[in-house]
Amino acid sequence: MENIARKERRRLNETKRFRKVKRSAALVGTAMVGCSVAAPLIQPVQVDADQTPTQFGARINTAAFIAEIATYAQPIAQANDLYASVMIAQAVVESGWGSSALSQAPYYNLFGIKGSYQGQTVYMDTLEYLNNKWVSKKEPFRQYPSFAESFNDNAYVLRNTSFGNGYYYAGTWKSNTKSYTDATACLTGRYATDPGYAGKLNNIITTYGLTKYDTPASGNAGGGVTIGNGGNTGNTSNSGSTSGNSGGSATTTGTTYTVKSGDSVWGISHSFGITMAQLIEWNNIKNNFIYPGQKLTIKGGQSAGSSTTNTGNNASSGNTSGNTNTSGSTGQATGAKYTVKSGDSVWKIANDHGISMNQLIEWNNIKNNFVYPGQQLVVSKGSSSASGSTSNTSTGNTSSNTANTGSTTSGSTYTVKAGESVWSVSNKFGISMNQLIQWNNIKNNFIYPGQKLIVKGGSSSSNASTSTANNKNTASSNTSSTATGQATYTVKAGESVWGVANKNGISMNQLIEWNNIKNNFIYPGQKLIVKGGSSKASATATIKPTASTPASTTPTASSTGDTKYTVKAGESVWGVANKHHITMDQLIEWNNIKNNFIYPGQEVIVKKGTAQSTPAKSDEKTYTVKAGESVWGVADSHGITMNQLIEWNNIKNNFIYPGQQLIVKK
């Protein structure tokens, strides 16, 4: 080291510190996901970020990393009205250019989304910006099978998260913004707690020109897709053709191609008229990762600069399907195929070809509704010879007629229109959501335009409207009484289980139990029991004072000698336990807390009465864990073994937390 200049030595030291911080923190910002409370149910896999494999060097090529993740970001962003540039920048910031343990195999979590994914979760150290300072915490994060699921899940969060009125991340949608800067501004303080989050994302987007991956909000492919050296394929009407600017090193058919900066697996395969699966198989590509200078085998491919007239039936199929809506294309033979274009989605393709989403997904084994430009999909099975346009026209007329005439007989069907939901359809036909869901085997309340639903038992559209109006008039008052003395309340738009319970002075558990609520799901117009018997007609008058009484902010003693505390908004199990100098285990045990879930207004025991408390043995010695300490460190400092500390305190996966009291002597 003596031969290294002082400035260079300082630079090297700073780089080492930077890498250590990146490895020791899974992410900077954290996504707000409602189901994260479910994570503790799953047996956690303990991972310390400091034990990350040395893979930072593999990701140091920024262009290669961007090219890899852009393969996923671009089609997913287009299908969800999001900015691909913002999604890519988020992945860069949250994963530290793919160097964090969380973003690497086998976790593939690029965005730091907490909770569990299909039962898979991993606990990692993370930095949270709380109370104007950075705090190290160990949190549960989702584990994905690949980057594709990570991008899809992030898009789902941005499109569907709602805590009341409207969607929480609607400010990130292209249709609601003027540029990507509006989207990054919306993410700051919502998606991430870092106050400088927007600036970091904007800097990455401008530095690396990520806007080239964005497309207009309309879903038009114009200018969005880049291949090779920036050639634009978005403005071509023929999905099989390529830009003459796509460049490339391929000199003869069936030879090799040298990857350039900005290339992606999709871009290269598209420019040579082959599928992504072929390119991946021929070159043994893992996780869609390629890098500049890499030579790829292009078997049977054509020169990147040539036309696509020789690509055979595949390109022809793409052209025919792409023109389905504008001309009377050739008849579809058995197993007709369609080549996915930029901006396409599973719903759009199914709708264009007069088939259901389930059929398209089943015929092509589509996972998580993920399709990508250049992918060939089976859009017709059987011997039907009708053209795609004829099928579309017929479907459109059917939908129009259904909408106009409604259902007139028992067991009739209804075609879903754009913007409709399970609630609105059931309300339109005077049936319950449960009936509509049961009759049509609807999953996760998901329906889509063009889907045919059984609305048997419902009246015609006109009668349904009258019935709905009558229902609304009857339920105009917020709370009413039933003949049995039970007070009921009609849910309004934007309300939640907690909100209704709090407004009516009851607990969430009571509201859930009295109304058999599942997954905390309620909907506008639903009537809920908010008082069990002996209520008067003016239920709201007796309930409102209770709701308006402010929650106690200081612990109160109960008749049993227990000290209780009322949970405030934003508090967690750890926060309440830490505030009252008890362990999380004590708080959970005393209050029978499930899944670490507490809610504002809940009264929890924070100190047991003298008669019920269990004093520690006189010869036992306890120690309170401080921030940054580990099982080994605590055991070593008290002259005991790790096994003793673990056994005496029933420690799982070597996980301890600040404020926890541990027995260190028996």
From Swiss-Prot:
SMART domains noted in UniProt: LysM, LYZ2
EC class of the enzyme, as a word: hydrolase
Cell compartment(s), UniProt: Secreted
Alphabetized Gene3D superfamilies for the sequence: 1.10.530.10, DNA polymerase, domain 6, LysM domain
Record carries keyword Hydrolase: yes
InterPro entries linked: LysM_dom, LysM_dom_sf, MGlyc_endo_b_GlcNAc-like_dom
A Pfam short name: LysM
Ranges where the record places region Disordered: 232-251, 300-335, 381-412, 459-485, 541-563
Assigned GO CC terms: extracellular region
Residue ranges occupied by any LysM domain in the UniProt entry: 255-298, 336-379, 412-455, 487-530, 563-606, 621-664
Keywords: Antimicrobial, Bacteriolytic enzyme, Cell cycle, Cell division, Cell wall biogenesis/degradation, Glycosidase, Hydrolase, Repeat, Secreted, Septation, Signal
Single GO MF annotation: lysozyme activity
Family of this protein: Belongs to the glycosyl hydrolase 73 family.
Name by which UniProt lists this protein: Muramidase-2
Species this chain originates from: Enterococcus hirae (strain ATCC 9790 / DSM 20160 / JCM 8729 / LMG 6399 / NBRC 3181 / NCIMB 6459 / NCDO 1258 / NCTC 12367 / WDCM 00089 / R)
